[in-house]
Curated annotation (Swiss-Prot):
Required for the development of competence. This is Competence protein S. GO terms for biological process: establishment of competence for transformation. Keywords: Competence. InterPro entries: ComS.
Length: 46
């Protein structure tokens, strides 16, 4: 869990786009795309 959390934070910091480009962020992170990538990047769109 520690590794996942660390990876998530990095992804969010790397892709703090307010545009809400979930697809782009998901493509960037294939490991977390099915877990939280879309969640953390989509919520910014709304």
């Amino acid at each position: 869990m520690n590794r996942s959390g660390k990876h998530l934070i990095s992804s969010i910091i790397l892709y703090p786009r307010p545009s809400g480009e979930c697809i782009s962020s998901i493509s960037l992170d294939k490991q977390t795309q099915a877990t939280t990538s879309p969640l953390y990047f989509c919520w910014r769109e709304k």
